[in-house]
Amino acid sequence: MKSLTVIALVLILSASPLAAEPAPEENCNDANSTAEIVQCLATQTAIWDRRLNLAYQKLMSSLPARRRERLRNAQRLWVQFRDANCAYFASGEGSIARVEAGQCLLRLTSARAQELEADT
């Protein structure tokens, strides 16, 4: 679990804080090394994480108290699921585990961001 926290921190810190809107998704498979793939996935995940947080904040500010509480609880459970699910992929053998964990974080984060954006 500690390694997933480190991965999440790397993903968050690797994004440019100046990116207001995400660029079109890069094809991370075009990278030349595992490290470049992992960095690409981290960059893309950070972009989607920013979108997710903006959508969450927008929803929280517009919902009545009862629905805010439900969204807060759902989001906390979603974070637990994401962390546990991606920790499974991170626990694999070799450097491919880093790629699989990065793909997991990108896939789940982008899906959740789109889900919340659709509700705003």
Q: What would you call each of these model-derived segments?
A:
Residues 18-120:
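N-terminal alpha-helical modules
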Residues 1-5:
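Positively charged n-region of N-terminal signal peptides that target proteins for export
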Residues 6-16:
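Bacterial N-terminal signal peptides
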